Amino acid sequence: MEDLYGILGVDHDASVDEIRRAYRRLARELHPDINPDSADRFKAVTHAYNILSDPEQRQRYDRHVSGGFSSDFNLSDLFQSFFDTSAEFQRGSDLLVNIDIDLKTAIYGGSQVVKIDSLVVCDVCNGTRSEPGYKAEVCFDCNGSGVVRGEVRTTLGNLITQNTCSKCRGNGERIDHPCRRCYGNGSRSAPRDITINIPPGVETGMRIKIPNMGNAGGAMPGDLYVDCKVKEHPYFLRDGQDLYCRLDISLVDALLGTKVKIDSLDGELAVVIPALSQNRDVIRIANKGAVTLRGGKGDLCIVLNVLLMQKLDPEHRALLKKIMPNPPKPKLAKRTSGFFSWLKNKFT
């Protein structure tokens, strides 16, 4: 178990002022907006300070340390009871941004840069909120703890409550000379370019969470949430795991068959068109469809669109009659439903 005094770098008999000075120094050094790799250490320092700066909590901690912990004692439960009230107000607010993603990126993944306006740590006061050359003073109302404690009588007994200090808004400091750049807020609005890593299989309506990329706060920054919308593709349509496209072919190629190359989302692809292909026949190519978030991959379904000749000269007419001297007579066909109707709605 880590020693809370050791986390702050103070002796076990350190005064409240010594503990407060140690915390302020470490907080400025380890703040996630200044040193992103030290987020865990910053959290530990904040936890240690919140316990040791409060006489009752410090006495309780010292008593457990000196007396030893029982086998079923959970230090995280002790921490949780101390920090549920005070940690949240120190965290920055979350941000939400909407992005449009092309179909290829949505299927195979990629990255996209978006510009957002968010609160960042002030580059003049480095988040101290005071004008350079001045220091913050301890808040008189909460004695620097950031919370005001009270006692409520209930039928179950007296309950100790903790509320964010309204005077310092939970910062524990009194700012007599506020920074002129950020007006004493410790942060300011600024544009930022954020690279969004898009996983394969994203669909419209999905939300991506990027931790600690939201607004700056007194401690941890908020999170950035990205709502995705997949743009329509001019040639390809996604339906579940499968991709659909329509391929125009001539009557000759439909009758005799051929081999063509198409530009799919996955690169150039050779497609064999069988002889005697009918209009709206579907050629299914396995594992060339859409990728899902779970890692599966669908098929590429190519719907054939046979193009009839728009004009026939006498020579062509005579040749067709010679090839097909007795064609079948026109007759009513039974109505079909299901897959054929679905394709018709998609591609007509």
From Swiss-Prot:
Q: List the disulfide bonds.
A: none
Where does it primarily localize? cytoplasm
Placement of CXXCXGXG motif repeats on the sequence: 122-129, 139-146, 165-172, 179-186
* Cofactors demanded by this protein: Zn(2+)
**Location of the J domain:** 3-65
Q: Name one Pfam family in it.
A: DnaJ_C
Family matches, as PROSITE patterns: DNAJ_1, DNAJ_2, ZF_CR
Q: Which GO terms describe its molecular function?
A: ATP binding; heat shock protein binding; unfolded protein binding; zinc ion binding
The processes (GO biological process) annotated in the record are: chaperone cofactor-dependent protein refolding; DNA replication; protein refolding; response to heat
Q: Keywords in alphabetical order, please.
A: Chaperone, Cytoplasm, DNA replication, Metal-binding, Repeat, Stress response, Zinc, Zinc-finger
Q: Please name the InterPro entries in this protein's record.
A: DnaJ, DnaJ_C, DnaJ_domain, DnaJ_domain_CS, HSP40/DnaJ_pept-bd, HSP_DnaJ_Cys-rich_dom, HSP_DnaJ_Cys-rich_dom_sf, J_dom_sf
Q: Which residues bind Zn(2+) 2 per the record?
A: 139, 142, 165, 168
Gene Ontology cellular component terms for the protein in this record: cytoplasm
CDD domains linked to this entry? DnaJ, DnaJ_C, DnaJ_zf
Could you give the cofactor binding note from the entry? Binds 2 Zn(2+) ions per monomer.
The residues the record assigns to binding Zn(2+) 1 are 122, 125, 179, 182
- Name where it's found: Cytoplasm
Annotated CR-type zinc fingers sit at 109-191
Record text on subunit structure and interactions = Homodimer.
- Which family does the similarity line name? Belongs to the DnaJ family.
Please provide the record's free-text comment about the domains of this protein.
The J domain is necessary and sufficient to stimulate DnaK ATPase activity. Zinc center 1 plays an important role in the autonomous, DnaK-independent chaperone activity of DnaJ. Zinc center 2 is essential for interaction with DnaK and for DnaJ activity.
Q: Function, please?
A: Participates actively in the response to hyperosmotic and heat shock by preventing the aggregation of stress-denatured proteins and by disaggregating proteins, also in an autonomous, DnaK-independent fashion. Unfolded proteins bind initially to DnaJ; upon interaction with the DnaJ-bound protein, DnaK hydrolyzes its bound ATP, resulting in the formation of a stable complex. GrpE releases ADP from DnaK; ATP binding to DnaK triggers the release of the substrate protein, thus completing the reaction cycle.
Q: What name has this protein been given in UniProt?
A: Chaperone protein DnaJ
Q: Which organism is it from?
A: Tropheryma whipplei (strain TW08/27) (Whipple's bacillus)
The organism that produces this protein has a lineage beginning with: Bacteria, Bacillati, Actinomycetota, Actinomycetes, Micrococcales
